[in-house]
Amino acid sequence: RQGRVSTLPPGVEVLRCWRNQLLTLSSETNCLTLYDAHDYPLVTLPAGIRPCGCAVVDCQVIVCGCEDGCLHIFSLPDLREIAVYPVPGCPMRVAADGGVLTCLSLLSPDPPQTLLFRLCLTSGDFAPVALLPGWCGAVTIADDHTIWAGVGEQLLHFPLDSVVPDVQLGEFGLIRFLSCQQSKLLISDPWAGRCLLMDTTPPYAPCQLYAGECGGCCFASCRKGTLPDWKASLNEP
């Protein structure tokens, strides 16, 4: 498979693929940019103040505006802003599950406190889940619609419709990205310089995939019902 190297604008916080195009969010330029298949910028639009998180769902992208205190919804591919939702604090991370957004928002920097909440795009209803000590790390939604969140030095799991975590794991740096697929949780922990893979069922034992300087990682595309043989790949030289 042919590789691809792209030149990106400064301060890129998030990279996302949409069809065969690349979407970037920069906290330095405060802009969301869509590139074509040849890395030519097609559209660039302002998106918040020091934005640092986004999620792509079908033909929409949800951006955490961070210091402007809003979640912004843009249509794809024209990046037209179609909705703005003011929320408490500085929204920094977001994950989408159908028409419901799950977000992490920094309420206080000293000491750091993070609000985990859900927002229904259809009704606009806001539902706080938990107020947690520590900085915003990452959030993702599992296949069973439950929440995995990294806040401070902890990784937490919230069952469906619960405001109390049933799993609390420590000894992380500050998790930057989480990705859940087929009962596997991929954990990017750049402060600790590692990427981990963990089953979403007990005994919750993270397996280190990579150690070193690491900005993030994600699952590659694969056929439904299949995942790479992680154990075999870890044994390769």
Language-model features and meaning:
Residues 188-237:
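Blade-level signature of beta-propeller repeat domains, shared across WD40, Kelch, NHL, RCC1
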Residues 21, 60-62, 100, 146, ...:
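Conserved core beta-strand positions within WD40 beta-propeller blades
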Residues 30-33, 70-73, 110-117, 154-158, ...:
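Structural motif
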Residues 10-18, 49-57, 89-97, 133-142, ...:
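Repeated scaffold domains used in trafficking and secretory/extracellular systems
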Residues 1, 18-19, 27-28, 57-58, ...:
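Short loop/turn segments that connect beta-strands within the blades of beta-propeller domains
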Residues 2-8, 39-46, 80-85, 124-131, ...:
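A short beta-strand motif characteristic of beta-propeller blades
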Residues 27, 37, 76, 119-121, ...:
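Inter-blade boundary loops/turns of WD-repeat beta-propellers
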Residues 24-28, 63-69, 103-111, 149-153, ...:
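Conserved beta-strand positions in repeat-built beta-propeller and related beta-rich domains
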